[in-house]
C-alpha cells in the first residue's frame, strides 16, 4: 500500500473510531473514554477503528501537545479500548495499533512527556482485551506505530516513556495474547544483558531478575525447562547490571520473569534467541534524549508475556506477571523515560528462529524509520534501545528467516537515520549491529543481503552527518565486500558502481579537491592491467618494502580525493566478486600498514603511490591471489591508523574500536559484508577478511575530506588532479614529499 493509501486508511480509521467511540456507546459494555487534553496542541491523526466495542477506550491526554497520527482501529471490541494518557507538552499519536477484536478495553496510552507522537502502531487483529497503554512521561514522545496485537484476550502492555521526547513509531504487534505482555522499563543509563538462560517450558512465570547491587552480571541464568511454580525473582536495583545471556523461552505457560535494571548503564550484549515464543517480545528501552522507533516487529503468536525489563521507573509493582498467550488481562506498560524517543517502525519479524538483535542508539538523534520486518517469529523480537537524545530508525533490513538473532543496532550519534537497511532474506546467524555514533547519520538503503550464513556487517558512522543512500546489495560474495569509510562531517553514499567481475582490483579514487562528485564510477568488468595511479603530493614517503603482489600485469592507480565533501549516493551491488570491493577510507589520523601481501610472481616492482599523509604503515594488506605485478600502495592522509589485518567494518569515527572476531557464517561463500568506518582517533584491525579469488587487489577508496559526495564514483578513466604520472609499464615508485611513510 502506498503512502496515500496508508494516509486515507488512517483518516478513515480515525473517523470511524471517533464515530464509534463517541456516538455508538450501545456497542460498548462500558462508557466511552474521557478525552481530557489540557495540551496546547493535540492532533488525532488516526484513532483506532473500533469495529465492535463492548466498551469505549478512555483516552487521557493531559499533555501540552498531543498528536494522534493514527491510533489502531479496533475491529471488534468486547470492552473499551485503553485510555491514552499523554500529560506531556507535546504528544503525537501517529497510529496506535488497531485492535481487531476486543474482549476488554485496550490499554491506556500515557505520555506525560512534552511531545509524544504515535505515528502508526500496528493493527491488532483480534482483541479480547484492551491494547496496552503507552506511557511516555517525557518532554516529547512519539508513538509512531505500536505493534498490532492480532488476538488479545487482555489488553496489550502500556508503553511508558517518561523521557523528554519519545516516539513509538510502531511497536511490535502481538498476534495472540493469553495474558498481558511484560512492562518494559528503561530508566537506567546502562544495562548489559549478556544472555539470559533460555527457558524451555514454563508452567509458571519465570523469575524476575532483581539486582540491588552496585554491579551485577548475569553471565547465564539457568534455563528453566519446566516450571510448576514461578522461578525466583532476581532483583537488581544496582547502577550497573549485565545480563550476559537472557533465556530464550521456548514455551511459556506463564509469563517470563521481569528483568529489573535500575542501573545507569544498560548493554544488551546478546539477547537470547528464543526459538518458539509462547511469550511476548522483549522490551524496548529508550533512555535517550530522543528516540524514534518507527515500527517494532509484530509478534504473531504469544502464549505468554515476555519478561519485563525494568529500568527504574517511577514506581510499578508487578506481583505476578500474567502469562500472555491469549490475553485475559492487560499487557504490561512500556516505560521509556528518555527525552525523546521515536519508534518509527521496527521490523515485523515474520519468521524468527531466534530473536532479532537489540538496536542500541545512545546518540542525540536517531531515526529508525523502518527496521526489517522479520516474517516469522519463533521468538520475540530484539529490544530496541535508544539512550540517545534522538534516534530514528528509518527502515532496518527485514530479515526474512532467522536461524539466530539479528545483531543489535547501535546508534550513539546525535542524529541517525536508517532509511532502509538491507533486508536479509535468510539468516543463519544474526545480522550485524548498526552503529551510528555520529551527530547525524542517514542510512538510506544498505544492501539487502539475500542469503546470509553469517550476520551482516555493522554500519558505523560516528561522523557529524552521514547519509547512506543505498549501499550495494551483495548477492553472492566470493570475497568480502569493501569497507566504506567516511570520517567526514557529512557523507552521502548515493550509489557506488556495481562491480561484476574483477580480473584486477578497481583503482582507488582520490580527489584532493574541495568538493568532488563521483557521478558514476565505471563497473570494471575485467581488468587486464590496473588503471594508472593518481598522486596527490605528499611531503615524504619511504617504502621499506612494497607489498608483493601475486600476479600483476601492472599496478592499479590510486584515486585520491581529499575533498571536504563526499556523497555516496548508492554503493554498487556486487554480484560476484573475483576480488574484494575497494574499501572507502575517510582520512584517519594515522595509518600503519605493517605487512603487505607476499608477492607470488613479480613481473616488475610495484610503483609507490603517495598520499600526503604524515605517516602510514601497512601492517598486512590482504594477499591477492594472482598478481602479474605488485599492487600499488594506497594512502589516506590520516593521522594514525593500524591495519593489522582487519575486516572492512563500516566505521564511524570512534575513539577506539576492536574487532575481535565477527560471527561465524554458517553458510557463506564469502565473509559477511564489511562495516563502513568513519575515521576514528585510533583503530586497530586485528584481521581483515581474506579475499577469496583475486585476479588483482581491490583499490581502497579514500576520502579524507570534511564532506564528500559519491554520486556514483567515476570510472577509472577519470583522474583527479595529480602532479603527473605516466606508467608505460609497471610504474616506478614516485615519491611525493611526505613526513614519513613506511611499508
Swiss-Prot record:
<feature type="repeat" description="2-18">
    <location>
        <begin position="504"/>
        <end position="519"/>
    </location>
</feature>
<feature type="repeat" description="1-15">
    <location>
        <begin position="420"/>
        <end position="428"/>
    </location>
</feature>
<comment type="similarity">
    <text>Belongs to the extensin family.</text>
</comment>
<feature type="repeat" description="2-21">
    <location>
        <begin position="579"/>
        <end position="594"/>
    </location>
</feature>
<feature type="repeat" description="1-21">
    <location>
        <begin position="570"/>
        <end position="578"/>
    </location>
</feature>
<feature type="repeat" description="1-18">
    <location>
        <begin position="495"/>
        <end position="503"/>
    </location>
</feature>
<keyword id="KW-0677">Repeat</keyword>
<dbReference type="InterPro" id="IPR006706">
    <property type="entry name" value="Extensin_dom"/>
</dbReference>
<feature type="repeat" description="2-4">
    <location>
        <begin position="154"/>
        <end position="169"/>
    </location>
</feature>
<feature type="repeat" description="2-19">
    <location>
        <begin position="529"/>
        <end position="544"/>
    </location>
</feature>
<feature type="repeat" description="2-13">
    <location>
        <begin position="379"/>
        <end position="394"/>
    </location>
</feature>
<feature type="repeat" description="2-11">
    <location>
        <begin position="329"/>
        <end position="344"/>
    </location>
</feature>
<feature type="repeat" description="2-14">
    <location>
        <begin position="404"/>
        <end position="419"/>
    </location>
</feature>
<feature type="repeat" description="1-19">
    <location>
        <begin position="520"/>
        <end position="528"/>
    </location>
</feature>
<feature type="repeat" description="2-10">
    <location>
        <begin position="304"/>
        <end position="319"/>
    </location>
</feature>
<feature type="region of interest" description="Disordered">
    <location>
        <begin position="715"/>
        <end position="743"/>
    </location>
</feature>
<dbReference type="Pfam" id="PF04554">
    <property type="entry name" value="Extensin_2"/>
</dbReference>
<feature type="region of interest" description="24 X 16 AA repeats of S-P-P-P-P-[YT]-Y-S-P-S-P-K-V-[DEYH]-Y-K">
    <location>
        <begin position="79"/>
        <end position="660"/>
    </location>
</feature>
<feature type="repeat" description="2-1">
    <location>
        <begin position="79"/>
        <end position="94"/>
    </location>
</feature>
<feature type="repeat" description="1-12">
    <location>
        <begin position="345"/>
        <end position="353"/>
    </location>
</feature>
<feature type="repeat" description="1-6">
    <location>
        <begin position="195"/>
        <end position="203"/>
    </location>
</feature>
<feature type="region of interest" description="Disordered">
    <location>
        <begin position="46"/>
        <end position="93"/>
    </location>
</feature>
<feature type="repeat" description="2-24">
    <location>
        <begin position="645"/>
        <end position="660"/>
    </location>
</feature>
<feature type="repeat" description="1-4">
    <location>
        <begin position="145"/>
        <end position="153"/>
    </location>
</feature>
<feature type="repeat" description="2-17">
    <location>
        <begin position="479"/>
        <end position="494"/>
    </location>
</feature>
<feature type="repeat" description="2-2">
    <location>
        <begin position="104"/>
        <end position="119"/>
    </location>
</feature>
<keyword id="KW-0964">Secreted</keyword>
<feature type="repeat" description="2-12">
    <location>
        <begin position="354"/>
        <end position="369"/>
    </location>
</feature>
<keyword id="KW-0325">Glycoprotein</keyword>
<feature type="repeat" description="1-10">
    <location>
        <begin position="295"/>
        <end position="303"/>
    </location>
</feature>
<dbReference type="GO" id="GO:0005199">
    <property type="term" value="F:structural constituent of cell wall"/>
</dbReference>
<feature type="compositionally biased region" description="Pro residues">
    <location>
        <begin position="47"/>
        <end position="61"/>
    </location>
</feature>
<feature type="repeat" description="1-23">
    <location>
        <begin position="620"/>
        <end position="628"/>
    </location>
</feature>
<feature type="repeat" description="1-20">
    <location>
        <begin position="545"/>
        <end position="553"/>
    </location>
</feature>
<feature type="repeat" description="1-9">
    <location>
        <begin position="270"/>
        <end position="278"/>
    </location>
</feature>
<feature type="region of interest" description="23 X 9 AA repeats of S-P-P-P-P-Y-V-Y-[SN]">
    <location>
        <begin position="70"/>
        <end position="628"/>
    </location>
</feature>
<dbReference type="GO" id="GO:0009530">
    <property type="term" value="C:primary cell wall"/>
</dbReference>
<feature type="repeat" description="1-3">
    <location>
        <begin position="120"/>
        <end position="128"/>
    </location>
</feature>
<feature type="repeat" description="2-15">
    <location>
        <begin position="429"/>
        <end position="444"/>
    </location>
</feature>
<keyword id="KW-0134">Cell wall</keyword>
<feature type="repeat" description="1-8">
    <location>
        <begin position="245"/>
        <end position="253"/>
    </location>
</feature>
<feature type="repeat" description="2-7">
    <location>
        <begin position="229"/>
        <end position="244"/>
    </location>
</feature>
